[in-house]
């Protein structure tokens, strides 16, 4: 079963010249180092050669949608979002609704915003140009600068942290922050709390601890910083008036430093270039890891000092963009890189002197990997998204178990989501709805601007055990034959 799913159209994404002012912003935002004119000619020529087949492959993917998915929602965004996260689940009129966090990265004609949306029941129909009726904007927060990253607090998911182009981390109580109307000239919303300590911009690396209200960040100052916001949780998490909005009755203000702030609990140095992503050990607020543009993976233990406890100096062959720690097995760490690969490291095989080899290496993307995340539903499964517009689902348990029908399928790949038409900048597995993913892409280089948000769940016939699926299909086959004979 998995071989047919893995053979889902591996559509190649075209990249046209930008058509909106926001494109220039986004191109620079994705932390890619500039290339010389000679280096940039090859991708351009490849784009032109691939363009003729893109429409056909995308059309083919659309025809397979009813077969490959149990549910699917496509929601067109006026402005791109660089991040997406699931929030708390709500019970409304007998139906289940879950909050979504995303952003609007604008070109300056209107303010940048942090958006809280409600997501309702999903379906299988695809409308490429429409705003889905199942995704409704609930509240808008005018954000001080572009929202590069959103992370929710596991102990209270109505509280989120955001990264922008500044050294500070902004903490928001999304429930008590006032709803704002984003028009040009409107003052910024005031964050409920500021986390200070970086000496340079901290744009992307951000994590919230699963066990305690700790926050982790990395930035251009090459440092990893740890905060404990426990002293402010009661204030920021209460349903009373938001402290960030108490300075002005409407919760508005151009000076985000006017609210309360928290200094770092620890500053950890060891990277030699920008820290691009960080992650907590799922069972400890004192253990965490980081990756950066120095191609290093570093593991830290706050109890033993501010130097790396373990590291891999050449974890990939290029910059590392993303990292995630397995919530089921504390020994496994996942990394993604500009070398187009995803790797899995076992911390039991790492040392403090920079030595360590991956236990798995996955090759299935054609461009830089931007996001990786372990599945909450199965310990061996994870997802990876990349600049090639694909979101791949992998299973470590399937490595080395290719069937004859899947000889061209990358080892370990068992599902490929090809619904986005440009780079998939972020995705998030739902903790409340099994095997459900929200993903976002920005469409500036393919279809001229805006973004796409998709909420989807692959067919359970794909991820369930094959013998179980075959037994069920055999029963269905017998039922069909019985009904046919009676008619």
Curated annotation (Swiss-Prot):
Positions of post-translational N-acetylmethionine modification: 1
Biased composition range(s): Low complexity: 1-12
Highest taxon of the lineage: Eukaryota
Record flagged with keyword DNA repair: no
Domain text: The DWD box is required for interaction with DDB1A.
Subunit record text: Interacts with AHL16. Interacts with LHP1, PDP2, PDP3 and PDP6. Component of the PRC2 (polycomb repressive complex 2) complex which regulates histone methylation on histone H3K27.
Free-text function comment from the UniProt entry: Core histone-binding subunit that may target chromatin assembly factors, chromatin remodeling factors and histone deacetylases to their histone substrates in a manner that is regulated by nucleosomal DNA. Acts together with PDP1 and MSI4/FVE to regulate the function of the PRC2 complex on FLC.
UniProt xrefs under PANTHER family: WD40 REPEAT FAMILY (PTHR22850)
Protein name, UniProt field: WD-40 repeat-containing protein MSI5
Organism of derivation: Arabidopsis thaliana
Underlying gene: MSI5
